[in-house]
Amino acid sequence: MTRPLIGIVVLSLVAATLWAADTDKRPQREQAFAAKLTGATMTGAFSLDGKQDKNQKEDKYQIVSAKKTEGDNWVITAKMKIGENELDVPIAIKVYWADDTPVMSLTDFTIPGLGTFTARVMFYGDRYAGTWQHGEAGGHMWGLIGKTPEKK
């Protein structure tokens, strides 16, 4: 009876130590994630459910800035073209961590004039991949992250 109890205590201590070590790295990971997205362009493609092979579309997002606010909350400011105007639109978003991998979570976010969006997007290295929903339409998205060239 004592032997299993000792094993459980040892495993608990190891798990607590690993969790503490991971928590210690979180601020550096968050800073690196903010730096990667600030001034970046995400270039890739997206698909529509049921039409993956037929309707793969080119996709591009320009990120002006990425800032952590409090807890899991971030503000991602993206350039968006609405009609003839190009605007910097701040989007309140949650970022959760799966080990060293950030995952953006956006649920039922309404952008006036564009509609309501839900997305889950994972970032690793210079790649991103995820799912999206806009009203009745939804699908997958994926691509590469690179720095936005400066305008001359």
Model-flagged regions — what are they?
Residues G7-A16:
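Bacterial N-terminal signal peptides
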Residues M1-P4:
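Positively charged n-region of N-terminal signal peptides that target proteins for export
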Residues D22-D24:
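Short linear interaction motifs
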Residues L18-A20:
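Boundary at the C-terminal end of the N-terminal hydrophobic targeting segment
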Residues R26-E30, K36, A40-K152:
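Central antiparallel beta-sheet cores of small beta-barrel/beta-sandwich binding domains
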